Amino acid sequence: PDIYSIGVQGGTMHRLTTSPAGEALPSWSPDGKWIYFSSNRTGKYGIWKVPASGGEAVPVHAEGSNSAASPDGRFIYFIKVLPETALWRIPSQGGKDELVLKNVANGWSFSLRRNGIYFAGKADAGEFAPIRFLSFETGKIRTIFTLERTVGYGLDVSPDEKVLLYTQLDQAGSDLMVIDDFR
């Protein structure tokens, strides 16, 4: 798939990427000038950006997916899944990546705010995922609550930080069935 934009009132769609590679998970830069996205143009998923007005896409980081710019625009946060799912960041202008969080439940369950990061943490054996908050000011992580089921794909926090949205897997297993005489 490619990345497209369209005005919220409708109108003409604008194709922003044209690569035969898989491209997904677009997000805006805070100033609205760039669109960050995941692409496997090089054979593995990495972070790329393209001007919001159109133009050539350029690589930001060789590996990772599900990127989001910090509210101040200084960093791009993203998920690396190997050897384990973790949240990383890189300066927006380029540079060395830095590990932010090791214990992220999956690549779609974090939400950046000016004062920190809300995220679904990895659950201990026999438990479900805790929703946690990493404070940028103190560097400390606190548990907000623990889900009663397995965390799904997606987590966000309202602008006033009073309501949290998340998905959960109500059935995380499989059923085994035998069907006789199915012909």
What are these regions (language model features)?
Residues 19-24, 62-67, 103-108, 147-152:
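Short coil/turn segments at the loop-to-beta-strand junctions that recur within blades
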Residues 26-34, 67-75, 108-116, 155-163:
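Blade-terminus and WD-like Trp-Asp/Gly-His loop motifs, strongest in beta-propeller folds
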Residues 37, 63, 69, 100-103, ...:
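Intrinsic disorder/low-complexity signature
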